[in-house]
Amino acid sequence: MPDDRMFTDAEALLVTRNAQSLEHPGGTLLEHLRRVGEQLADWGASREVQLAGLCHAAYGTDGFPVSLLDLEQRGTLRNAIGMQAEELVYLYAGCDRGQVYPQLDQAAACFDDRFTGLRTQPDRKSLRAFVEITAANELDVVRNSSALAAEHGLRPRGLSQ
C-alpha cells in the first residue's frame, strides 16, 4: 500500500478502535485489514479502493458483526480516509451478502442496505470497487482458515497469490 498520511491515519484509527485485539482468521482483524489493503494494492486498485479495503470492517460486515465505529461516527472515518473511500466502506458494510452476491455476475446490482433497509443501485465504479474489496477479503479469509476453505470446497494453498 502507498505510504501516505491517509493510510497512516486510517491505521492509527483502527488501532485506537482495538482492531489489533480482535481475533480474525490469520491473526487479528488489523492484520487481516492490512492484508486486504495490500492485496488491493498488488492488483493495482485505486488509492480510494485500497483505503476502503484497509477499513472495510470499520462498521462491521454481514459476515463479521463486530464494529469498530458506530454509524454515527462516519465523519470520523471520512476525515481519515476521504469521502469516496468511506462511502465504499459503508457500501461494503451495509451489504446483505445473501441478497447481493447472487447479482454480482450482472452489469448492475441492487443492494438492500442492512442498516437502513433501503434499496440502492451503486454506479458501475462503486460496484467494481465493491467486487474488488470482496474478492480481496474472501481470498484472505480462505487463505488463512483451512476450515472455511474446506467448507467452500477450496484448497487455500492452491489459490493464486
How should these model regions be labeled?
Residues 1-19:
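Membrane topogenic helices and adjacent juxtamembrane segments
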